[in-house]
Amino acid sequence: MHQFSAYKHQAATSTSMQPSKRRYFVTMKLPFDEMLDASGKARPHYQIFHNWLKQQSDTLMGLKRAEADLIFRRVGITFAVYGDDLGSERTIPFDQVPRIFTAKEWEQLEAGLRQRVKALNRFIYDVYHDEEIIKAGIIPGEQIYNNAQYRPEMRNVNVPRDIYAQIAGIDIVRAGEGEFYVLEDNLRVPSGVSYMVEDRKMMMRLFPDLFQKYRVAPVEHYPDLLLECLKSVKPDDVKKPNVVVLTPGMYNSAYFEHSYLAQQMGVELVEGKDLFVKNEQVFMRTTQGPERVDVIYRRVDDDFLDPLAFRSDSTLGVAGLLSAHRAGNVTLANAIGTGVADDKSIYPYVPDMIEFYLGEKPILNNVPTFQCRKPDDLAYTLANLDKLVVKLTHGAGGYGMLVGPASTKAEIEEFRVHLLANPDKYIAQPTLALSTCPTFVESGVAPRHIDLRPFVLSGKTIKMVPGGLTRVALKEGSLVVNSSQGGGTKDTWVLEE
């Protein structure tokens, strides 16, 4: 039998913080464990799995993990790691212990996600049109106009249904019972959804008996929902939209996902060289002549989309694409300029957006955030670097950040120099006690910190599959779940009532 009996909560140092002006007070607690309560007993919705897991041997679980890795590698479910001396292609480590939500928990999350994404789309429309939120003094104009993701080329450009972020990946963490926080909004080219679907397929292949014990909400219909969403935001004059997936190419870290989604939706996977613009319309080169393209699910960043409008050295985009987009002849999902809403410098204002545009209180809370561009916040951050997580406002993938409690004095002092040189580029947040989930590691089953990325589709209506991609920090004590930093993934179960 495996060393499941050793599974227990990891201790965490209790700390508190009280900044000036905002008077936030966040107390570090023992991490909330998804499976076990404070007494060490399995939570009701985990009891069946808990009993099943105790009966599995280390040998069997190790063999199952090796089988999953072999299948993922054969199928090509890998991602690229740039600058990695060990090789450019890796499988994302898959953990066989699922993360389980009750139907009630998911109901709360789904309501909060719908609310948040709706407000974010309203915000993007507003900043490129009437600027009411700036006029109301809720967000300073310079926070938007000086944002590297703000695209003045999109001023007064209308998009179908006024939806700019058709696909959103919202990163959520849990700090306690029913205590969910949004850690980050991903509105440009959110990735990871293919791993959500493939993780479910793998769990059903490895442990089919578990799905006889639980009624788990399905996720495999995500590509169908995505295609339905993309077709619903077609240009107004189009009857039967032609949808394509635009990829930077096979060397992109998420190329598997691009090809997977195109194949599952039954649409063409194209690169920039496969498309051209004529008379402000986009066409695809085919063996039977040019074919008009109406909706592009683009997995290429703004800067590389159009060499005539953005980076002139880009070979990944399509010359003239911006003009076709502005003319309303092609829909880009997501629209150019959506990044203005997911930049970390804008993140602190999302609760205000929800109240301003929807007249509602946020269902999902933000993590308290200090904006280092503000003198008081900077002073507090500098005095508490050993307790905080400090991030670049334009950063991604777990790079360019400091996790104070996990850093050495030398690392903290080195980071202090960067922060003082460019305080406007940083935000800081308390080090939350992210929830843990049992994870199969070399020593047996042990708690590891996790987050959740649900995928929200906004078209004619807002839809999502139950759950999302659970990411896990495989290193003991680590809070960094990104695959580029050694993180893995888990299947996410939402139980049906």
Which positions does each model-derived feature cover?
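Preference for protein termini
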Residues: 2-497
